[in-house]
């Protein structure tokens, strides 16, 4: 078994692994380098969950616990040395959304809250020089966080269809019937003049940073990878097409760079359906755009919204129910959990059936945020917690909450 999700021939094969040929011949059986690449990107998404402050008694609820410099290492991402976080992304919504998506400090808290309107929604990162050597190019990653609470949001979210024009750029004229999910689009495009963190929308924050990085590395071979899980997967889908449709994957027109537009790939896990068939056609019309959707058998979220919406991505089907390490049948929670998804990717055997870990991925991670492992494994459920829940004894002998570094 490979000892690291970053080992293998990724540097030499990155265009193929990034979807240049729509992953033809790579999914069944699942190519080892592609498997490793998916796991690495999945860990970059998992870092958004492991770094998110979900303690509503904290004035920093809804923010990131860590700073740019230590987020990936503190969250345990194996690619921590291969990427540097360059920007945090914050989101709000112009529509009412479930608490599972925007988590805010308790109204009764005495210390001033960091924000009453916004949440930390992810980050932009770029490959370090070490990462370039491992990846074969300067990869820009946009990682979107999903929900942190129950799955009840699938029944409560606003599934009203609205025109997809805001993310289709000039292609909107050729695709006037393309529609997307109003709730997802609202979180992606909303700003709030009263919020310090969302005077610009999440969309504008990301596009500005991607353009800055494309300018900085205009003479290098680059790629853009947009990743997310659950609701974050929906935002990643909107973001990926938006980047291409509005030319953010191109070197700046004012530069003398000879580099062509770089490929943009969305790698998403457990994604709800974002748009209709016309949106899928619009998505497919961009030659530099690809999307791969990892979908677990039995997970209900990819079936929502149930009517009028379709999946735009190439599907990689997995089944965690085949794993001999996990309880079977799984629960709604475990079948949707990202760490369980990554466990499934590590062992998926496709049409051959069965389950075999092809990379050395610790099975204990499956219990990181849920109760998925069989009882014979000595791993407590939901074991990922900050030491003393971020309570620290100060020099004066009093305990205080230290749960943020950088906003």
From Swiss-Prot:
It is found in: Cytoplasm. The keyword Cytoplasm applies. Keywords: Cytoplasm, Hydrolase, Lipid degradation, Lipid metabolism. GO terms for molecular function: phospholipase A1 activity. Belongs to the AB hydrolase superfamily. Lipase family. Acylhydrolase that catalyzes the hydrolysis of phospholipids at the sn-1 position. One of its GO terms (biological process) is lipid catabolic process. PANTHER family: PHOSPHOLIPASE A1-IIGAMMA. The active site is at residues 230, 299, 336. InterPro entries: AB_hydrolase_fold, Fungal_lipase-type, PLA. One of its GO terms (cellular component) is cytoplasm. This is Phospholipase A1-II 7. It comes from Oryza sativa subsp. indica (Rice).
